[in-house]
Amino acid sequence: MAASPPLPTSIDGGQVLDDMEVVEMKYLFGKVLMPSDVSWDTEQLVIPDEHVGKLLDMVVMNRPEGGFFVVVVEDGEVTGKLWLFRYWKRDDVHCLTKGWGCYAREKGLRAGDTVSFFHSTACGRFFICCRCTCMSFLSLPTTSHRIHGSSVLPQPRAAQEAHHPFSGHATLCLGNKASDHSAPARHATASLGCAAAQPPQVPPTPTPRRRRRSMMVHPEPPEHTTDGMPVILESMALVSTPPVAKRVRLFGVYIDVPPLRPGGEATQDFNP
């Protein structure tokens, strides 16, 4: 059977297409998936003890003679699609085994997502619906529940059912006429009896800008030099040193001969 076209924007007191069947469903139970529920090694959904009684109402015998017990549910998103899960019990542990792994892989379920079961009292059918969170954790603590992408402290059972995303009654619209383009039907979240709590939006933290260090090199002014002349860094006064006298030995006696001036006269000022 082909799926129905998408729902209109409003369901409660709003517009419903002519080719849709409105099904009133009663919420049975739900579970926040744990890593063991979506593991490819086990491929089983463990049912909590407080919901075992409601699960047994869904269990039917597949084969009367030596058969096994199964749970037949209808997909709440795809019209006319049935899922068959094998019921298995061991050491007071109730779980759904064969068929659950295919459902989890097709829906892309991960730890932290929610799966819920419904019952239609009018037609006697059972439905399964899932809600994938945007941020699913790989592991969740057993003392907390994940609702709308946020981890909260454990609450009393009545409070948990009141805040459950699928608690109370839900309205499901199914398509009756065949359609060329298959589109999954959607639930009317406005008729679930609770408003979807949006997590508080935290403003983004501004990232501090890194300051770039810039180094500017100022060229030194060129030195004014004259071709062929050395550069004088510091001027000093020139002091003339008196000439040194010559010492001559004559007949065993040393005689100091004073230096001569440019005019040929002997100098009186000299260093002996």
UniProtKB/Swiss-Prot annotation:
UniProt xrefs under PANTHER family: B3 DOMAIN-CONTAINING PROTEIN OS02G0455900-RELATED, B3 DOMAIN-CONTAINING TRANSCRIPTION FACTOR ABI3
Spell out the residue ranges making up region: Disordered. Answer: 189-227
Write down what this protein is called: Putative B3 domain-containing protein Os02g0455900
DNA-binding region positions on the chain: 30-134
What lineage, starting at the top, does this entry show? Eukaryota, Viridiplantae, Streptophyta, Embryophyta, Tracheophyta
User: Main localisation, per the record?
Assistant: nucleus
Which keywords does the record carry? DNA-binding, Nucleus, Transcription, Transcription regulation
Question: GO CC terms for this protein?
Answer: nucleus
A GO term for molecular function: DNA-binding transcription factor activity
Where located?
A: Nucleus
Pfam families from the UniProt entry:
B3 (PF02362)
Which organism encodes this protein?
Answer: Oryza sativa subsp. japonica (Rice)
